[in-house]
Amino acid sequence: MSLIECKNINRYFGSGENRVHILKDISLSIEKGDFVAIIGQSGSGKSTLMNILGCLDTAGSGSYRIDGIETAKMQPDELAALRRERFGFIFQRYNLLSSLTARDNVALPAVYMGAGGKERSARADKLLQDLGLASKEGNKPGELSGGQQQRVSIARALMNGGEIIFADEPTGALDTASGKNVMEIIRRLHEAGHTVIMVTHDPDIAANANRVIEIRDGEIISDTSKNPEIPASNVGRIREKASWSFYYDQFVEAFRMSVQAVLAHKMRSLLTMLGIIIGIASVVSVVALGNGSQKKILEDISSIGTNTISIFPGRGFGDRRSGRIKTLTIDDAKIIAKQSYVASATPMTSSGGTLTYRNTDLTASLYGVGEQYFDVRGLKLETGRLFDENDVKEDAQVVVIDQNVKDKLFADSDPLGKTILFRKRPLTVIGVMKKDENAFGNSDVLMLWSPYTTVMHQITGESHTNSITVKIKDNANTQVAEKGLTDLLKARHGTEDFFMNNSDSIRQIVESTTGTMKLLISSIALISLVVGGIGVMNIMLVSVTERTKEIGIRMAIGARRGNILQQFLIEAVLICVIGGLVGVGLSAAVSLVFNHFVTDFPMDISAMSVIGAVACSTGIGIAFGFMPANKAAKLNPIDALAQD
């Protein structure tokens, strides 16, 4: 069985009236160890034939077999495997990647074989040394002469073994001396057992081969052999490794090359990132503002009591009949306090009236409450003491005043121990409350607190309360507790002539409302992210167009479609992730400045918003980078190589 066998190969370019028949029923076979020169004038079809033999192009019709396997039935990645594992290409224009050193250019085919970094470098250095380039390993193509670049190209062709060497006009761009040197290397490769297929238009170059096939106008006009074939030796090559390190090495290499591509166009990369930076900074800042305002509001709610349920007469706030409902009593509060889920229950009654001290009369509100009311509501004492259980039991004529009362009546004196009159009833001041700075407590209303027994028995003369404030135990569910209290009072009153205000419900409403606002504003900020993503896609499409030649080179040396897709996708994600991290940093800087100058509420950047921002930027990189990356992966190798 021949190594290579072609039967009736035809190739056409164009369509319709512009259709050109390039190859016409080409049939040939090539044995292992053969050195074949395909000669012909420009436009004869010789390069097209070599591209088909090297699986860079496909025939329009006919059969092409490698070791008896029909290539027409192979998938793109199977053809890539042939180029990677068995073929080596020597191009007229060298086709080296300008951003890589000689060593990295030579080692590149082994990347797609899964060879480790040390193994790749050692083999590349050995090949360069064998070709007289030991001192040029770190040089880039622009720092090498034409002959040196071609020797690097030859070393690359041998990196994975190069069982079959395809040489396309290998001396076409070289001077005479360099051309002779390259041909000597190719002859040695043939003598070492490599099968060599060379395309040339020069009869003197073709004379180095032991078999010459001449093509004219797409047809073979002669096929002559002058020397017997040399038996093929076992050409060594790196074997593909299907292990986790295989995928890891490929990812690391793709990442490294993506970093090089980003750094190669620093300003363009920065401008591309700008949309992502602004978008991420906007989203993180908006969420931070939402978190800060929500935190401030919830702190204010907590300051007036957490885990509390307030019970009022009537059907709801604004119920005009509530003033006539007198069923909420002290006994209700006592029964409620005995429930297993209740920490405390304090009744409250209130009265408005004239507050008198010496010759000053003021309008104030007096609240009759239990001794636990202050703790439940989170009110703090500034000076003096609060009334206790004994004061409540004894109807003590004591009062705790707020800062407004102190400022109005005792601006220049100590109020403790002083007697004031409320509705002409004497009350002794025993304490002063701190000014309540939360959002719900900034008021000019003059407020006083006395034991509810004192207010009910000595001032209002009523037996019912205006409300009952219930403190729920920390381990109890407030929703369950609310239902239990409702059932209890309905059973006692015989009807539901009351309503409840659950502080946790307020908290949930605030959280829901601020969450909705954050989502709404974030969705607006996300528009800039989408715009940034479109910018990334645009630049990646430009990058694919600019690097089409590079893509063709990588495909020629064995890169799978997945390798090309991965590299360009990593590049897009890298741009977006860097942009995302810079955006988070920018938001953090804005937060520091904001929190320094604004004290009402902070910008609170949470770990989740940072994680979400990075995840979002990664998702944008994948979403908007996939189309350009997929376009690159689907390029035809020969079409990509033809781009300048």
Curated annotation (Swiss-Prot):
Where in or outside the cell is it found? Answer: Cell inner membrane
Keywords on this record?
Answer: Antibiotic resistance, ATP-binding, Cell inner membrane, Cell membrane, Membrane, Nucleotide-binding, Translocase, Transmembrane, Transmembrane helix, Transport
Record EC number: 7.6.2.-
Note the Pfam families from the entry. ABC_tran, FtsX, MacB_PCD
As for membrane topology, the entry says: Multi-pass membrane protein
> Which GO terms of the molecular function aspect are on file?
ATP binding; ATP hydrolysis activity; transmembrane transporter activity
Please report any disulfide bonds recorded for this protein chain, giving both cysteine positions.
Answer: none
Report the PROSITE patterns cross-referenced here.
Answer: ABC_TRANSPORTER_1, ABC_TRANSPORTER_2, MACB
- Which GO BP annotation is one of this protein's? response to antibiotic
| CDD domains xref list | ABC_MJ0796_LolCDE_FtsE
Q: Which residues form the signal peptide?
A: none
Record domain ABC transporter: where:
4-242
Q: What are the GO cellular component annotations?
A: plasma membrane
Transmembrane domains' residue ranges: 270-290, 524-544, 574-594, 607-627
User: Record's InterPro entries?
Assistant: AAA+_ATPase, ABC3_permease_C, ABC_transporter-like_ATP-bd, ABC_transporter-like_CS, MacB-like_ATP-bd, MacB_PCD, Macrolide_Exporter_MacB, P-loop_NTPase
Residues that hold ATP according to the record: 40-47
Q: Domain of life here?
A: Bacteria
Quaternary data = Homodimer.
What this protein is reported to do is described as: Non-canonical ABC transporter that contains transmembrane domains (TMD), which form a pore in the inner membrane, and an ATP-binding domain (NBD), which is responsible for energy generation. Confers resistance against macrolides.
Q: Which PANTHER family match?
A: MACROLIDE EXPORT ATP-BINDING_PERMEASE PROTEIN MACB (PTHR30572:SF14), MEMBRANE COMPONENT OF TRANSPORTER-RELATED (PTHR30572)
Q: What family, per the record?
A: Belongs to the ABC transporter superfamily. Macrolide exporter (TC 3.A.1.122) family.
Q: What is this protein called?
A: Macrolide export ATP-binding/permease protein MacB
Question: What is the species of this protein?
Answer: Neisseria meningitidis serogroup B (strain ATCC BAA-335 / MC58)
Q: Which gene encodes it?
A: macB
